[in-house]
């Protein structure tokens, strides 16, 4: 058995050059106490049947469900609507959107402006990394979203709010994402509970409080 950066390499791992070369943080994940090398092999399932049986999980205030919680590389989510979020999510990795039912709008910050990107049923959209984005989902919409697991990678997520009147940034949180189903809620509550954070430094407009998070 040989070593790589002080970590023993079994013949099994030496047979995986594509994985070792592709992911620069592979060894960090292998040696992490919180990660296993490979998740258990799961059998295929009928996605539409799963959606039909779990629609109650895809409603506010959470609206999303991670399908493979043991996966080490990808978060594979089903996301439902409606939502009424005004925040923008900031991800240092790319995000893949595939719209299964209905049409949604992803508002992005592009060249200092809020720009709407419509994703119709059956359409796919790859959002580049580091683009603030706010998915706006109507009632009876279902979408698939795939993004990178953050744990074991030097990545931080962000939540941002921009003024409704002049698009000036109101506030921003940066944090390591551990659980995509629960980690946003405390930041939502902190922002909406503070009139100071919701007040624009540029035009003095105050964003309305969202009673769901207070």
Sequence positions of predicted segments:
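Low-acidity, Ser/Thr- and Arg-rich intrinsically disordered low-complexity segments
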Residues: 10, 14, 29-32
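Cys/His-clustered metal-coordination modules, chiefly Zn-binding fingers
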Residues: 148-214
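Short, conserved beta-strand element in jelly-roll/cupin
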Residues: 90-109, 143-146
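His/acidic/aromatic-lined binding-pocket segments of jelly-roll/cupin-type domains
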Residues: 76, 87-90, 94-99, 116-117, ...
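A short, N-terminal "cap"/entry segment at the start of jelly-roll beta-barrel domains
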Residues: 23-80, 85-87, 186-214
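Conserved metal-binding segment of the jelly-roll/cupin
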Residues: 79, 119-139, 147-148
